[in-house]
């Protein structure tokens, strides 16, 4: 899927030159748009000219707690943040009261939180990278911690986040 996204016109025939991901790029240039592709269960980052900068496998919302269907805007990123569970806003846990989980290995939002304009929704890391690629979040978009950090470092407030099917 990644190779097809990088080479939409390729036939993948013997001897054909194609683009491949350079996973050792280090820092991303500034991201101008984020696309959450629900059908590919992935996050794509683009520069201002529309060039694909990064492709990250992701976890998205489940059927009962879906990921949004509309465009949102990034409001900023918070590394190593607290996670606050509010049963009035998120009815997916067993707790019946407000809980705060400090930063660390068991924090549900992992190493970084990219805040979005819809209350309680964001793009974030995870303490369980083996679950990436599943449809099991509470509506947010999960990435591995290393991917979430890389993306957060390149995203400024005001970047559009578009959800596509």
Residue locations for each model-derived region?
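Well-ordered alpha/beta subsegment
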Residues: 158, 162-165
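Gly/Pro-biased beta-strand-loop elements
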Residues: 28-126, 153, 157
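Immediate flanking context of iron-sulfur cluster ligation sites
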Residues: 126-135
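Short glycine/proline-enriched turns and hinge-like loops at secondary-structure junctions
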Residues: 67-68, 134-136
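Extracellular LysM carbohydrate-binding repeats and other cell-envelope/extracellular binding modules
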Residues: 4-33
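LysM (lysin motif) carbohydrate-binding repeats in extracellular/periplasmic proteins that recognize
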Residues: 1-13, 51-54, 146, 154-157
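Short beta-strand-centered segments at strand-helix junctions
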Residues: 137-152
């Amino acid at each position: 899927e990644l190779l097809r996204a990088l080479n939409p016109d390729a036939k993948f025939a013997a001897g054909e030159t194609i683009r491949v991901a350079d996973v050792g790029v280090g820092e991303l240039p500034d991201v101008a748009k984020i696309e959450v592709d629900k059908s590919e269960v992935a996050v794509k980052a683009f520069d201002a000219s529309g060039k694909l900068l990064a492709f990250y496998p992701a976890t998205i919302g489940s059927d009962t707690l879906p990921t949004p269907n509309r465009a949102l805007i990034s409001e900023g990123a918070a590394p190593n943040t607290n996670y606050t569970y509010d049963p009035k806003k998120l009815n997916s846990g067993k707790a019946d009261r407000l809980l705060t989980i400090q930063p660390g290995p068991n924090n549900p939002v992992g190493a970084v939180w990219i805040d979005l304009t819809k209350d309680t929704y964001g793009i974030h890391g995870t303490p369980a990278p083996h679950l990436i690629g599943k449809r099991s979040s509470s509506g947010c978009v999960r990435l591995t911690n290393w991917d979430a950090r890389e993306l957060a470092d390149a995203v400024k407030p005001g970047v559009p986040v578009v959800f596509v099917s």
